């Protein structure tokens, strides 16, 4: 939504106007078919939709009432409430962590919502606590079981699995400089600008770059 608002959103399949904004939603079941495992009053997570008529939607789903297949929604604890929208971001983090030949990250770029979830899921799944880079002092708080540092204070150059959750497309040279030979960099954010990096350093280290998209139903 920020990129759409600022006009910086690059051409993307499904992008057009009129546009239904928003992504996932949390709501209360008002009506359910007979025999469904959900009942009226249940709180559910609702993924976005591409099923709008005469309108475009980049997974949009912002509406007072939604009609959806029972197989697409996920029942959540009522105590979670509106925070249940984070299920999508958590599933996106899991999707990045379970890619082909994926390894747990030992470095995460960015301590926003996705970066925090990547770090927490890594630890819960049995991985070693990763280092997280963050340049905004306000975002350095809230770490539990892992360390958040400013990249300028990190002298390591032996990271083997780097996950980017910042969406920055202009910093790959810095990340590669902190990598060991054969390291993998996972681009888990969304990038409005072209990805650029100097080839010689990446060539000498034989860096692998993997792109991770949004979550799939299996991740949920």
Predicted regions and their residues:
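C-terminal substrate-binding/catalytic core of Rossmann-like NAD(P)-dependent dehydrogenases/reductases
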Residues: 192-220
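Glycine-rich beta-strand-centered segment in the early N-terminal region that forms part
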Residues: 6-50, 79
